[in-house]
Amino acid sequence: MPGFNYGGKGDGTGWSSERGSGPEPGGGSHGNSGGHDRGDSSNVGNESVTVMKPGDSYNTPWGKVIINAAGQPTMNGTVMTADNSSMVPYGRGFTRVLNSLVNNPVSPAGQNGGKSPVQTAVENYLMVQSGNLPPGYWLSNGKVMTEVREERTSGGGGKNGNERTWTVKVPREVPQLTASYNEGMRIRQEAADRARAEANARALAEEEARAIASGKSKAEFDAGKRVEAAQAAINTAQLNVNNLSGAVSAANQVITQKQAEMTPLKNELAAANQRVQETLKFINDPIRSRIHFNMRSGLIRAQHNVDTKQNEINAAVANRDALNSQLSQANNILQNARNEKSAADAALSAATAQRLQAEAALRAAAEAAEKARQRQAEEAERQRQAMEVAEKAKDERELLEKTSELIAGMGDKIGEHLGDKYKAIAKDIADNIKNFQGKTIRSFDDAMASLNKITANPAMKINKADRDALVNAWKHVDAQDMANKLGNLSKAFKVADVVMKVEKVREKSIEGYETGNWGPLMLEVESWVLSGIASSVALGIFSATLGAYALSLGVPAIAVGIAGILLAAVVGALIDDKFADALNNEIIRPAH
């Protein structure tokens, strides 16, 4: 990216201004623009520029100018061209600014299409650096040329002389534009080289990534590339050997042919020599000596032919020997390439074996890790299940203990009406509930057999007033409220589940009081167990529901006593048959 100096004092701001050292700039023919007697150089070579390299930058009031990798000026990420930007005065010089940011573009300044000489020089510099030559410039032997006007003078001098002056156009190099052109070529070549190197690197990286993605290791990929290079070297060396072998064969054929051509020449030489020997006797004969000299000339020609042919043979042999030497070198190169190929193959095999070994080790490690993970998972699951069992057991114990307390409390309250023996039976039932964990409730048939002992007792006949009072008490039970209260007994069940169970117990209890059929109530408890609820939990929920109902009763004492006996009978029937007998023998008959 160019800077410039038009000869002013300069403000030292780099490319956008100038670092001048000359006198103040002048106008017309004054200043450093040249004398009137040596012509107009069209502002060529008079303004100096400073080359900025890719990556250089400077600040202007309109934004930061950055030279990109291609040597182009950019502002706000946009490459500035003659179409989208203008030369704007800045300091004591000019700088290029995007048109969209310029409020007042540079006004015309004389010649050059309204542009100042400095502005024109900078734009020419930019254009040439981009590889384009402005009108009036051309390239000659790597130099940027243009035409300049020069004055020529002829004739005599003095006051009365006939001196004549005229102007001619002559070609002249513009060194600064030549440097700009070469700099642009260098920048573009470097950019092309970088792009090519980056493309090759990307291609190699993509190939390597594909190879690794297919399962190859980095070492295996590198070894494979080495094998490819070695094979290419073998192919080249083999082609060279083949060519040289053909050349040696051709040289041997030439030698054979020339040796064959030598035979008649030697025969001719021998014949010529024979003729010379035969004419030696004429050498002193003035008349016939001419014959000898003619034969002698033929001998010389024959010897020359033999020598020439021998030289050709020697040259052919030397050529063959040279080719053999080259062939030997080529064979050595070929052998070296084959050795390299063997080494590369070995390296590839080793890398492949190493990869396979590593993969096997990885698989073994993965399998071991998976087995360890499975063992850990199994152990964690065992621990979780054990904790869950322990937690359930804890919840069940908590439920049974609190239910036991509830039943004991119910026994104390109802015992106020039925006496201490009822309290003792209720306490026995409460203790059985407390220790019921791990046990199972009695079957429906067995439980009903025990319960029927109570309901069949004539003394357990319930009059209508008491029945209505007990049924009405059940009808006023709020299942949600009771479930919320029972929910505090244990985490063994959810309140939502208890609501449904309380509702079922309420419905079946009402049915029992109204019809005297307590089978549906007993079947309800059995259905809980069949659905997966532990017997202890089922007994706890059932007993707690009935106990909470009994504790909430505000009915006459006789009705409370009936409810207490039926509660003990129903709950006790699920635990042991003895409670039915105790109720019949110790509570019901004495009470009625």
UniProtKB/Swiss-Prot annotation:
<dbReference type="Pfam" id="PF01024">
    <property type="entry name" value="Colicin"/>
</dbReference>
<feature type="compositionally biased region" description="Gly residues">
    <location>
        <begin position="23"/>
        <end position="34"/>
    </location>
</feature>
<feature type="compositionally biased region" description="Gly residues">
    <location>
        <begin position="1"/>
        <end position="13"/>
    </location>
</feature>
<keyword id="KW-1133">Transmembrane helix</keyword>
<feature type="region of interest" description="Disordered">
    <location>
        <begin position="1"/>
        <end position="57"/>
    </location>
</feature>
<keyword id="KW-0614">Plasmid</keyword>
<comment type="similarity">
    <text>Belongs to the channel forming colicin family.</text>
</comment>
<comment type="function">
    <text>This colicin is a channel-forming colicin. This class of transmembrane toxins depolarize the cytoplasmic membrane, leading to dissipation of cellular energy.</text>
</comment>
<dbReference type="GO" id="GO:0060090">
    <property type="term" value="F:molecular adaptor activity"/>
</dbReference>
<dbReference type="InterPro" id="IPR038283">
    <property type="entry name" value="Channel_colicin_C_sf"/>
</dbReference>
<dbReference type="InterPro" id="IPR055023">
    <property type="entry name" value="ColA_N"/>
</dbReference>
<keyword id="KW-0812">Transmembrane</keyword>
<keyword id="KW-0044">Antibiotic</keyword>
<keyword id="KW-0929">Antimicrobial</keyword>
<dbReference type="GO" id="GO:0140911">
    <property type="term" value="F:pore-forming activity"/>
</dbReference>
<dbReference type="InterPro" id="IPR000293">
    <property type="entry name" value="Channel_colicin_C"/>
</dbReference>
<keyword id="KW-0472">Membrane</keyword>
<comment type="function">
    <text>Colicins are polypeptide toxins produced by and active against E.coli and closely related bacteria.</text>
</comment>
<feature type="transmembrane region" description="Helical">
    <location>
        <begin position="555"/>
        <end position="575"/>
    </location>
</feature>
<keyword id="KW-1003">Cell membrane</keyword>
<dbReference type="Pfam" id="PF22348">
    <property type="entry name" value="ColA_N"/>
</dbReference>
<feature type="region of interest" description="Disordered">
    <location>
        <begin position="373"/>
        <end position="395"/>
    </location>
</feature>
<dbReference type="GO" id="GO:0005886">
    <property type="term" value="C:plasma membrane"/>
</dbReference>
<dbReference type="GO" id="GO:0050829">
    <property type="term" value="P:defense response to Gram-negative bacterium"/>
</dbReference>
<keyword id="KW-0078">Bacteriocin</keyword>
<protein>
    <recommendedName>
        <fullName>Colicin-A</fullName>
    </recommendedName>
</protein>
<dbReference type="GO" id="GO:0031640">
    <property type="term" value="P:killing of cells of another organism"/>
</dbReference>
<feature type="transmembrane region" description="Helical">
    <location>
        <begin position="528"/>
        <end position="548"/>
    </location>
</feature>
